[in-house]
Swiss-Prot record:
CDD domains, per the entry: Ribosomal_L22
Protein name: Large ribosomal subunit protein uL22
Family: Belongs to the universal ribosomal protein uL22 family.
Pfam families: Ribosomal_L22
Molecular-function GO terms, alphabetical: rRNA binding; structural constituent of ribosome
UniProt source species: Roseiflexus sp. (strain RS-1)
Length: 113
């Protein structure tokens, strides 16, 4: 059985989030959280929050054992970008895109329905 958690509009670029996700994909939830706890990335904190939410969804909504959960799927989709303007020389301006990310985590206990 699977449980899912999504964190939307995280103010980090998806390209910065994906390498951190690769470290925990396929690992048990407890081990994944231990790995993320010691990483010096902002993305690690956001991913850990989403994994904890998925674990809580699994235990409260589906009565799964929290010790048996594995991070089955984890991915980052691109959210909307905030558009900002950076003034440049001679009256010009450049557009800055502050990117956002939607983090999705699906945990599984390995049992079929």
């Amino acid at each position: 059985m699977q449980a899912k958690a999504v964190t939307k509009y995280v103010r980090i670029s998806p390209t910065k989030v994906r390498p951190v996700m690769d470290l925990v994909r396929g690992k048990p939830v407890d081990r994944a959280l231990a790995i993320l706890r010691y990483l010096p990335h902002k993305a690690a904190r956001e991913i850990a929050r989403t994994i904890e939410s998925a674990r809580a969804n699994a235990t409260n909504n589906y009565d799964m054992a929290p010790d048996a959960l594995i991070v089955k799927y984890i991915f980052a989709d691109e959210g909307p970008a905030f558009k900002r303007i950076m003034p440049r020389a001679r009256g010009r301006a450049d557009r800055i895109r502050k990117r956002t990310t939607h983090i999705t985590v699906i945990v599984d206990d390995g049992e079929e329905m």
